[in-house]
């Protein structure tokens, strides 16, 4: 480049906010860029293949990868969709693979900035690994003599953590249990109206990204879109996600991206009125429509929780219906908020083996037991079916997650972090705070539950939520001919009964890898094993009314700002 260019550079660094609609960070970047006649808005997404993506990027404790190929593919799709949406606005998206600190530094240097500083705007991150990346960016740019300001903008929750009115010191003062938090927030706080897409009108976009890059002679290839191989995934990983399992509970033809996220919300709430029955069907396990399936798009920011909550409120208003179902969807978004705020308050304690309650306990790390759990070969059909579904599709129902967590931590006595890391690798909807705190809750080491141990009655759960074994047979086809009365406990069948249904225990289907006698004892008169002591809550109850907070809640108790 010959000579420095005079302009204001404002980089929007997309992270877990892969959308235009209701994106506070993007709105902030547009405002900064629009404040100067020579302002440039430069959108970029960086695949960090040194810390997140690739077959060889592993978790700290286990051999689980930080991001499995299925979620990586979903994010690739989301980034491609984001680029298309930006291009429709006259903009574009630069996509790079590498360390964010290196790439952001190179961009600033190639553009030869003469303005006072570069604005780098991104959505706020709260956990240590993500914050470390922020620090790496700041350190590297400073070492290169680049003047910059890194803006981290909150935008992934229903409520802004900086304006939690009932709590004097914001997230640092929130209760360590959910119910009092929920009551205060619903009483005193309002959900902000979702923001419009800030660049849905070309006149609001300061510059066309491609034209500016061409004018200043920047050598960035802004049409580049990496493949899984480019991100460091091996052939086996790539082949494993090349097809969609027909048994998948995800909506047919689902893809990553804001376009598909908005389509799913429209389908679930408006086109099919599935929202009407959500409260009653949310604990099912077969099919695409028993639950919203919004979570994968929420996790990578293809849609905002405020948008979903607003659609629920609009549904109540336009259809004249206020029900447990519409409320419960917003309630679960509030739980998601709480986990994020809780993680902000307690920091790295959400990753400690002793949990946020700092309860020391000897955890096993038996690799054979852990692998049997991962492979869905434990001998307990409910556990095996759920684990096989996760491996094949990247999805598992909420009911399934609770049971497999309880089984790993409380029956196998394996370090709960092994499970959390495996979920981090496999889940399409992996969210740091939600994943790790749900695992802490299940292992009984979380302040959220007061350290209470809720041991799930695996067999009873199986009989309650999959009475006829439809889900079990779907994912454990070797049990296809086992009768309904034995499908939940195949190890209790006699040899003659096994011969009759063509199944040999230990050969066609594994024998139980551990004796959870108390579970069997309370579910069958022909059980074996000595009962174990449990609290009054044996797995958070098993009826559809297992959430006592509903008793005291007015329907539609969430509030929106009218601005």
Predicted regions mapped to residue ranges:
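Trp/Phe/Arg-rich N-terminal binding region typifying the photolyase-homology
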Residues: 1-206, 388-389, 434, 438, ...
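Alpha-helical packing segments of well-folded alpha/beta enzyme cores
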Residues: 25, 78, 82, 100, ...
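Generic recognition of cysteine residues
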Residues: 27, 67, 89, 122, ...
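Charge-dense, low-complexity intrinsically disordered segments
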Residues: 65-69, 73, 252-255, 259, ...
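Soluble or luminal CAZymes and related metallo-dependent hydrolases
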Residues: 74, 78, 257, 378, ...
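Glycine/tryptophan-enriched, flexible segments
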Residues: 146, 170-357, 465-466, 470-563
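Active-site-proximal binding-pocket segments
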Residues: 287-478, 484
């Amino acid at each position: 480049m010959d000579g420095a260019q005079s302009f204001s550079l404002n980089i929007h660094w997309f992270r877990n906010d892969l959308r235009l609609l209701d994106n506070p960070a993007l709105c902030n970047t547009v405002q900064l860029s629009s404040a100067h006649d020579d302002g440039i808005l430069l959108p970029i997404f960086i695949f960090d293949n040194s810390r997140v993506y690739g077959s060889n990027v592993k978790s700290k404790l286990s051999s689980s990868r930080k991001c499995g190929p299925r979620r990586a593919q979903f994010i690739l799709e989301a980034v491609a969709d984001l680029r298309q949406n930006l291009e429709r606005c006259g903009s574009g998206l630069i996509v790079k693979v590498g360390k964010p600190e290196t790439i952001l530094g190179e961009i600033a240097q190639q553009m030869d900035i003469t303005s006072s500083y570069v604005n780098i705007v991104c959505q706020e991150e709260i956990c240590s690994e993500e914050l470390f990346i922020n620090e790496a960016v700041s350190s590297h740019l400073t070492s290169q003599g680049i003047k910059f300001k890194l803006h981290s903008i909150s935008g992934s929750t229903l409520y802004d953590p900086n304006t939690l009115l009932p709590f004097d010191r914001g997230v640092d003062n929130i209760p360590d249990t959910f119910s009092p938090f929920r009551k205060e927030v619903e009483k005193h706080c309002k959900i902000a109206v979702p923001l419009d897409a800030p660049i849905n009108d070309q006149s609001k976009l300061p510059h066309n990204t491609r034209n500016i890059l061409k004018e200043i002679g920047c050598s960035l290839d802004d049409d580049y879109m990496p493949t899984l191989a480019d991100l460091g995934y091996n052939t086996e990983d790539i082949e494993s996600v090349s097809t969609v399992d027909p048994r998948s509970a995800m909506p047919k033809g689902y893809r990553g991206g804001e376009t598909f996220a908005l389509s799913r919300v429209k389908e679930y709430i408006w086109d099919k009125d599935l929202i009407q029955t959500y409260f009653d069907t949310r604990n099912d396990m077969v099919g695409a429509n028993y639950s919203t399936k919004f979570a994968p798009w929420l996790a990578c920011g293809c849609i905002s929780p405020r948008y979903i909550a607003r659609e629920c409120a609009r549904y109540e208003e336009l259809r004249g219906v206020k029900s447990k179902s519409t409320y419960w969807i917003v309630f679960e978004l509030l739980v998601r908020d709480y986990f994020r705020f809780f993680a902000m308050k307690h920091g790295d304690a959400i990753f400690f083996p002793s949990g946020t309650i700092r309860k020391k306990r000897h955890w096993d790390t038996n690799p054979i037991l852990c692998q049997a759990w991962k492979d869905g070969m434990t001998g307990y059909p409910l556990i095996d079916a759920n684990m096989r579904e996760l491996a094949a599709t990247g999805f598992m129902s909420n009911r399934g997650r609770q049971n497999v967590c309880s089984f790993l931590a409380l029956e196998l006595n394996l370090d709960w972090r092994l499970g959390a890391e495996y979920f981090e690798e496999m889940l399409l909807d992996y969210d740091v705070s939600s994943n790790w705190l749900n695992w802490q809750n299940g292992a009984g080491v979380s302040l959220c539950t007061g350290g209470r141990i809720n041991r799930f009655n695996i067999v009873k759960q199986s009989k309650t939520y999959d009475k006829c074994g439809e889900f079990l047979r779907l994912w454990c086809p070797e049990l296809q001919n086992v009768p309904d009365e034995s499908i939940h406990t195949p190890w209790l069948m006699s040899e003659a009964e096994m011969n009759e249904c063509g199944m040999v225990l230990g050969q066609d289907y594994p024998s139980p890898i551990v004796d959870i006698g108390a579970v069997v004892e309370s579910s069958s008169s022909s059980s074996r094993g000595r009962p174990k002591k449990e609290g009054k809550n044996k797995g958070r109850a098993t009826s559809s009314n297992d959430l006592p907070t509903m008793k005291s809640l007015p329907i539609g108790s969430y509030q929106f700002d009218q601005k």
